[in-house]
């Protein structure tokens, strides 16, 4: 079983997993640096067929918003690990696990209702990487 120290370390893994996508999406706001995000979204909306594109200003704007939210969420999780976890480890675990589950449900439902169901399957892997051993309370 996982210990509090394991959970605290895993919070940093969670922050890095969440935060990775933020700069990628923010870079997609500029035509010269949008290919990684475009390819990533193409893979998430399987099959790889050139959809979606970053041709519209709306897509670039939504990438800016999403990138910012993801970086902010990642910084929050990192700071929960470094500033709060020692004082309230179970509360931090709950906050991150429930937050990740809320993201999973809303993002997956939105993906399915918009016809992009493959993303809901990818979301399972992301959820498992974010939550990791924090599904259960620490044993110490």
Language-model features: locations:
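Residues within membrane-spanning alpha-helices of integral membrane proteins
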Residues: 11-18, 67, 97-100, 104, ...
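Short juxtamembrane and helix-loop transition motifs at transmembrane-helix boundaries
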Residues: 28, 54-60, 77-91
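Membrane-helix boundary elements
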Residues: 20-61
């Amino acid at each position: 079983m996982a210990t509090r120290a394991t959970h605290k370390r895993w919070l940093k893994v969670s922050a890095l997993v969440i935060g990775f996508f933020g700069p990628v999406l923010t870079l997609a706001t500029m035509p010269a640096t949008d290919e990684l995000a475009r390819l990533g979204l193409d893979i998430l909306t399987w099959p790889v067929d050139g959809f979606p594109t970053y041709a519209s200003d709306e897509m670039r704007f939504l990438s800016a918003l999403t990138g910012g939210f993801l970086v902010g969420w990642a910084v929050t999780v990192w700071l929960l690990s470094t500033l709060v976890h020692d004082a309230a480890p179970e509360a931090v675990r709950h906050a991150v696990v429930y937050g990740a589950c809320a993201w999973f449900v809303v993002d997956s439902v939105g993906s399915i209702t918009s016809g992009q169901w493959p993303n809901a399957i990818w979301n399972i892997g992301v959820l498992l990487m974010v939550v990791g051993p924090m599904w259960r309370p620490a044993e110490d």
